[in-house]
Structure formats: C-alpha cells, structure tokens
Amino acid sequence: MILARDDKWTLGSIALIFVLLIGFALLFLLERFRVKEKSRTFKDCVNVYQCPSKGERVYLALRHWFIFLATHKAQMTLILSPLVMLVTIPFTGKETKNSIASYDWNLTGVAARLGYLSCGLFFVSYFFSLKNNPFCLMLFSSHEKMNYLHRWLSVYAVLISVLHGILFMIFSAQSYKPLLYDKISIYGYFITVVLFLMTVASLPSVRRKFFEWFFVLHHTCSVLIIFLIWLHHPRTIVYMKACIIIYAFDRGCRLFRSIWNRSNFRIYLLNEDMIYMVGRKPKRSFFALPWAAGSHVYINIPSLSYWQVHPFTLASAPFDDFIELFVAVHSGFTERLANRLYSMPHEYPNFSLAPGTPESLSNTYRELNSFKSYAVEIENTAQGHTYEPEDLYLETTVFMDGPYGTTSNVFKEYSYVLLIAGGVGFSYTLPILRDLILKECNVTSITFIWSCRSLSLLKVASKSLNSLLHQSNVRLKIINHFTGSISCKESSEFSNQTTENSEMEFFDDRPDLDMYIQKFFDYVGYQTAALAACGSQSFLKRIKNSVNKSISSTTDIYQHYEEL
C-alpha cells in the first residue's frame, strides 16, 4: 500500500518521537561519561572534595528536576499531557482539503487526520511494548522503563481515536449518513468496545489484583485491535502491517529463547510465603540480549500451566554459572506453586554436588544443602508446626525467557552507592552489591540496607552477605533490620561483624530511612552517588520522601527504583 499525502503528518509525529528519544539517549551517554570521569578522578585523589562550579550547580539543579519527574510518574504525566496535546494540534491538519463536504469547516479532514495519527501512535505504542527494544540498549535500561511510554502513548492514541470517531459521527448526523449499518462505522464500534475493555483491564488496581486475567485479555485485545483497524479502513493497513511485523518478531524471539533455555530447576519452599529456585544459567545465542546485575527473567512451568508466564528478579549476577530466584508467595501462580510443593510427598534427599559443579555455586544453594541441621519455625501461631526446607522441594522443567534488564551496571561509575531493599526486594540489590565488590569499578563506599521479616530468608541471605563482607576491598556497611515477631539476636548466627574496612549489623526494628538517607547525603558531599531501592510501593514512597527532604541542589546523585 502506497502512503498517501496525508500520511506525512503521521510519519512526522512518529519521527518526532523517535528523534527525541535518540537525542535523550545521546544526552544520557554524555552524562555517563561525565560521571565516570568525575568518579575516576575522585578515586585517584581520595579525600579531595572540590566544590562544584557555577555551571555544574546549574546543571545539577536541572538534573534534579528531571530525576524528580522521572521518579514521580504522576507529576511527570500532569506536565507532559498538555504539552503532548499542544504538539499534536499541528498534526491534525486543518489545512487538509475537504473533498467530502466543501461547505464544511474541514470537519472530515481533521477527523481523518486524527484517525491516521492514532494509527501511528498505536504503532509506536506497540514498539515500546517490545521486550526486545533497541532503545533499551541505547539507554542501558530495561524494557520495563519503556512501559511508561507504552502506556501513555496508548492513552493518547485511544483519546485521539475516540475524538476521530466523534467527529465522524457528527458529520454523519449532519449529512444524514448511515450510522448503524455502514461497514466502516460497525468496525469503529467494535474497536471502541475492545479499547474500553483494554482500558478497564489496564487500570493499576485491576491490573495488580487480576494480573493473570489482565495478561490474557491485554494480549488478546491487542491482536483484535490490529485486525479490526485493518478492516476499518484500507488506508490503515500499512500501519497495522508494521504492528504485526514488530509484534511477531518480538514474540518469535521470546519463544525461541524460552525453548532454547529450557532446563531443570530445583525449587524449595523456604517458608509459607517464600520460594527459592535455582537452575542453569541461560545459554548464549544470537537472540540473547546483554544483561547485568539486577535483571529479570520470565518463567513458565509447564507442569503448572503452559500459558502462564511470570517475571522474577534474578538474585544472581552474569558472571555466575547458575541463576537463582527468591519468589514471594502471592495469590495466583506463586500460590499454586507453593501448594504444589506442600502437596508432594518427600523424603529428605541427599543433595551431593555432582562432579564438575563449579566452585562458584551460590552460598544460598550450599546452605540449603546443609539445612537439615536445623528447623525453621513458621511464624504462624495458628499452624504452630515446624518443617525443614528440604522436605518441601520440587525438581521440574522450566522454560525461561530472558534475561531482560540493564545492559550494564551503571552503579559502577559512581563513587558512593546506597542500596536499599525491603523483603524479597534484596534479590535485586544483592547481585548489584556482588557485582560492585567482585568486579573492578569506580566505587569507593557502599551502604547496603535491608529490611526483612522472614527468619529463614535472613539466614540464607546472611551467608552471602557475610562472604561479601570479607571479600570487599571498598568501604562496605551492611545493615540488616529484622521485623519478625521474634528477635534475630537470639541466634548466634546473626551477630555484628567488623573487618578492616567493612561492618555488618543486625537490628530488631524497622529502619529509620530518614536518618540513613540523610547520613548518606552528608557523607557523600559533592561527589557522585547512586541510590537503588527495591520493595513495595509504600516502601519506595517512603524512600522517595526521605530523599526529597535530604537532597540539596549540589547533590550529584542518580536514583533508580524497582517496585515489587
């Protein structure tokens, strides 16, 4: 299909979006170079604090505003929405010749142009939903960060398409055109119904509560939209072909990776609300993407369901010969997996390490192999029973798509790093910590804060943290806050430790985030710093509020938040 003259405006809007992103990617590369050079200079000249110049102060102030908006999506949406609408106005094409009704104020011309524009935005929205997105590689970021663009471009596309339909209905009513049995109108009504279903299913409250239903409905409606718009008008076919090509390419790559990375996983139930999984590292292939610490994979367990795929954060790093996952048990897929573990009859297995097992095998896995020496008490008085994790294990085939995530560990470029996690969120911050300690970087000081209420999880993770404590060549402070119903200090395994330049502490209360973040900013001074946090929505909100209260205009800090 040859593009018509009017399509130039739609192509112009698509090009504008991509050009802006390419420009942003170039600025991001320049920022990384600036941070790397500043951190390298500081590392070579320890304890040399230079006050930022006037130009750097202005730059940091502008950067703070950008980071604030990037980490507060609601405020960014309020600012960007009217700007996007203003930019959209020129692309509606009021100068378009009205060949249908010359007496009209160009109503049909504007309505048609809005239809083309919405098709173009649907294509861009599909593009940013791809797991295999080239902009992720350019920005050293995860496809999850593109979801913001995917969602809001979809919203704008829906609003513009609805306006397109309303204008044509007004014209049809004025011109006494058929509204109910016209072919184009009928497909338009079907498109409206499907878009309404997608909008309702995509609401945050609905999406979180019924994620599995949302996943199925969202993808089904996405395919329906393509074919309905295809049938709606012949001039839209070229845009829908583009959507089909990129959608099929992405799905094909993911399917190939899932089959290629099929392997046996050993799955343990640490306690009533925590699952541990360990398996073979993903194979290298032409379709594999580069990944770094803090990445995630999509897991499918055929013995539970062939159709359900769920994302989980990797607690291992790229240089490991294995991958491990810590999974919190919620309703749905993870609950069924936990019930499967409960229902299986077990005898205590003798997990001797097979010949050729790498020495780098995780402390977690080795600790599980020796877990028989003690029992974990479930903190549930209604149950009142104890069990040992080895008695609740499963070995099964897993299809694994990924890993996906950042292509490099950006935290390596900063002088000071603060890692904060709540609960199973430590599976995101732990591999970053390991990567910073075991690999060469510009970091001179790391603070690791973790709040946890699971005693068994704390015991398993403390082995890895203790090992890192004695391997660290930089200043390392590990702070563990146990929020369970009993005291972790009753066990001799959770004792404070100090080495030449590192220390690890245990506390039986909630962390005072305001105090920790303020101390970190005071310690950083004018040098480069990075903060990474992972936890629940409320946990991250507390951290963001603490950062906003403590940050100054000269603080040179990068912030990254991962919501569980």
Curated annotation (Swiss-Prot):
Glycans are attached at residues 106, 261, 350, 442, 496, 548. Heme 1 binds at residues 150, 218. Residues 114-229 form the Ferric oxidoreductase domain. Its main location: membrane. One of its GO terms (molecular function) is flavin adenine dinucleotide binding. Heme 2 binds at residues 164, 232. One of its GO terms (cellular component) is endoplasmic reticulum membrane. FAD binds at residues 310-316. It is found in: Cell membrane; Endoplasmic reticulum membrane. Residues 254-410 form the FAD-binding FR-type domain. The chain crosses the membrane at residues 10-30, 66-86, 110-130, 152-172, 184-204, 210-230. NAD(+) binds at residues 419-427. It catalyses: 2 a Fe(II)-siderophore + NADP(+) + H(+) = 2 a Fe(III)-siderophore + NADPH. Its cofactor is FAD; heme. Signal peptide: none annotated. PANTHER family: FERRIC/CUPRIC REDUCTASE TRANSMEMBRANE COMPONENT (PTHR32361), FRP1P (PTHR32361:SF28). Belongs to the ferric reductase (FRE) family. This is Ferric/cupric reductase transmembrane component 2.
